[in-house]
Amino acid sequence: LFPYTTLFRSGYTDLLVNNRSQAPVQELEAAGAKGATQQEIGAQCDVVITMLPNSPQVKEVMLGKDGVAAHMKPGAVFIDCSSINPVASKEIYAELQKKDVEMLDAPVSGGEPKAIDGTLSFMVGGKQEIFDTYKPVLDAMGASTVRCGEVGAGNTTKLANQIIVACNIQALAEALTLAQKAGVDPELVFQAIKGGLAGSTVMNA
């Protein structure tokens, strides 16, 4: 729940929170947030934000039996910060539209450290006017918030991001293995090249 802790610190204090494990909920409750069921969140919140492991979990929480969506009011907005299949994002949005509920798919990059300090990067898909209205909410949790297109574009951009990250990791592994086999200390290679063109956030992670 790190992003939501940052959201709370930024002044969004009227928060209802839910999590599978209770320790993070209790931490936010101690700060002034209120623990709630999925059904209560759907019925009482104008904006619902999720960050879940994958597509099945998002669909279950939102669209499952007595899920959040069943209780959301017309005009409410769902912001999904999970990294899921773009097709699943579009499928969820199609169901939400039947209830006159809007959606932004807004996966993040940056990992736990950036979640803690509020410097995540958000890749967002959704209508321009919905993005413009709720961008301040995402800005409260991140350092970069970019609209990439309609719903599904956020998770498509996240896929592109992960391809680049994976290629960086593979190239870094091969380069440092080459250095080590040639008798050069990989740590010294890292120190020598991290400030040059080969340097990257992936390298420094």
Language-model-derived ranges and their functions:
Residues 12-16, 46-48, 76, 120-121:
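Short active-site oxyanion
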Residues 2-7:
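Short, small-residue-biased leader/transition segments that mark boundaries at the very start
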Residues 153-205:
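Helical "substrate-binding/catalytic lid" subdomain
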Residues 9-31:
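NAD(P)-binding Rossmann-fold cofactor-contacting core
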Residues 38-103:
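Rossmann-fold NAD(P) dinucleotide-binding segment
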Residues 83-162:
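Rossmann-fold dinucleotide-binding core
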Residues 28, 45-48, 58, 79, ...:
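Buried hydrophobic positions in well-ordered alpha/beta secondary-structure cores of metabolic enzymes
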Residues 15, 35, 100-104, 145, ...:
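Hydrophobic beta-strand scaffold residues
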